[in-house]
Amino acid sequence: MGNVFMKKCDDVFKIATEFIAQKKISKDYDFLIVDFHGEITSEKMAMGNLFDGYATLVVGPHPHVPTNDARVLKNGTSYITDAGMCGDYESVIGMNAQNSINRFLKKEAVKHFPANGEASLSGVVVDCDVRNGLAKNIESFIFGGSLNNVN
């Protein structure tokens, strides 16, 4: 969990640094995917750069909106700020749009309900080097629903 807007969480950068010091890709594990649940782009990008050369993929899933920045970083870690969601994009991050609008209008917490429209499947495919566990290529995808894949 990221630390920005989630203050009750442990210091994720301290924990990540300790992990990197203790574990090595291709020695302790074949591949490493860092699923970094965070609110803001800069924090996710910093985590991607911290793990560059130590992880196969750093992906940030939390805002649910796919970004167009999939790439392999200079030391071989694939990165994307947000792979998107599996859900209805004719909604508010997968939840019923009107219910979400009412939450903002009334300034009170209301229960969220999933949207019932056609779902999209969003994600990434990473081509990895089995010798070192690092990425050779990353491609994002979107299937179904109202968003069109531009790749």
Predicted features and spans:
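Active-site-proximal beta-strand elements of phosphoester/diester hydrolases
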Residues: 1-3, 33-35, 80
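Short, well-ordered, mixed-charge alpha-helical segments that flank or form enzyme active sites
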Residues: 4-9, 40-44, 67-68, 147
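Divalent metal-coordination and catalytic microenvironments
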Residues: 33, 62, 126
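Short beta-strand/loop segments at the ligand-binding rim of alpha/beta enzyme cores
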Residues: 27-36, 54-58
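Conserved beta-sheet core of the metallophosphoesterase superfamily
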Residues: 41-114
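Conserved active-site and cofactor/substrate-binding residues in soluble primary-metabolism enzymes
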Residues: 7-15, 46, 118-121, 133
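Binuclear metal-dependent hydrolase catalytic cores centered on His/Asp/Glu-rich metal-binding motifs
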Residues: 1-29
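A short C-terminal boundary segment appended to hydrolase-like catalytic domains
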Residues: 100-151
